[in-house]
């Protein structure tokens, strides 16, 4: 192979590599951590809390997954968080959303009510219902999300 053909071959290979990297960088979403105002702004505009809860087709998991998807569509990272709760000596789970804000740290969102809960308030052995203004008694036994686990 002559030097000229080799140079053209290398140029072709690098062009393909560059185009594939360039294409990938613009077609893979990059998600950012929001600040608290961006989180609050999103919650005020979004209508997820207006959906009707249904045990069979739209429960806490669907509320939370829809929040995470729509928040990502706006360019922000969040993840679901599982709460292990206790009520009347029965254990059960509940799914909410965890969001790390750049300026104020970790928060949790109850997407059914749009309540924003500080990680300092979502502590073990407290009544979750008091945090979201529901009339029930669900004692928090564990909080698990992509940001960490509390037992």
Tell where the protein language model's regions lie, with residue ranges.
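A structural boundary/capping signal
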Residues: 3-151
């Amino acid at each position: 192979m002559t030097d000229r053909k080799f140079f053209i071959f290398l140029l072709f290979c690098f062009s393909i590599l560059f185009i594939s990297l360039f294409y990938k960088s613009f077609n893979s979403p990059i998600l950012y951590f929001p600040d608290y105002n961006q989180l609050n702004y999103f919650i005020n505009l979004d209508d997820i809390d207006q959906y009707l809860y249904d045990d069979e087709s739209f429960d806490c998991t669907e509320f939370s997954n829809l929040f995470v998807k729509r928040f990502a569509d706006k360019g922000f990272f969040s993840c679901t968080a599982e709460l292990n709760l206790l009520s009347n000596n029965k254990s059960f789970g509940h799914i909410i959303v965890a969001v790390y804000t750049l300026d104020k740290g970790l928060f949790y969102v109850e997407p059914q009510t749009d309540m924003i809960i500080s990680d300092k308030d979502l502590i073990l052995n407290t009544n979750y219902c008091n945090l979201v203004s529901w009339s029930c008694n669900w004692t928090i036994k564990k909080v698990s999300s992509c940001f960490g686990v509390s037992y």
